[in-house]
Amino acid sequence: MTVIAPVITIDGPSGAGKGTLCKALAETLQWHLLDSGAIYRVLVLAALHHQVAIDSEEALVPLATHLDVRFEVEQGKLSVVLEGEDVSQAIRNETVGNTASQIAAFPRVREALLRRQRAFRAAPGLIADGRDMGTVVFPDAPVKIFLDASSDERAYRRMRQLQEKGFSVNFERLLSEIKERDDRDRNRAVAPLVPAADALVLDSTRLTIDEVIAKALAHARQILALS
């Protein structure tokens, strides 16, 4: 009898704290991690490395199908490794991000990457970080969490991150951008950003990250009977 590895899906809007929560869960439980938001960016780098035409859906599909990528967490730091090389910084390049949005428009590439994401499911378990992990990618996951926070709080968090990196930022502009993205994500025709029907909805607006982690762990342990 084949035992299917459990999955904990963490969905939610940008700035809600998904990344921090997922890293903490992966380290605490010693499970695998999937950062779905990085997948398309990694594919762009792989295409550049292998001189595959970015505008060729036919050429990108086999590359997406066999994408050699893994996500490693150590002491709260996430490393994205492509073909043995740490590309954590390279995927944050603005050009890479813009190109990733372009290739995401290819239906067959999306389908290939959907299958590739599902292949991350392996023992002892998987923490899946994204926007449609519980609704589209792993609809059978036993533990689904939708992490949310007010748009004001998410804009404030983003502002602090940018300021810590030395950038001058305008809060109102950040807030406007976040609200616009929320509207797009929640009203798109394919895989809208909504909690799965059986997801635990956690509002992190007035919670510390330690409180969020504790609530998520307690929920997962109750469902999965983890020690």
Curated annotation (Swiss-Prot):
Its EC number is 2.7.4.25. CDD domains: CMPK. SUPFAM superfamilies: P-loop containing nucleoside triphosphate hydrolases. InterPro entries: Cytidylate_kin, Cytidylate_kinase_dom, P-loop_NTPase. Keywords: ATP-binding, Cytoplasm, Kinase, Nucleotide-binding, Transferase. GO terms for molecular function: ATP binding; CMP kinase activity; dCMP kinase activity. Pfam families: Cytidylate_kin (PF02224). ATP binds at residues 12-20. Belongs to the cytidylate kinase family. Type 1 subfamily. This is Cytidylate kinase. The lineage of its organism: Bacteria, Pseudomonadati, Pseudomonadota, Gammaproteobacteria, Enterobacterales.
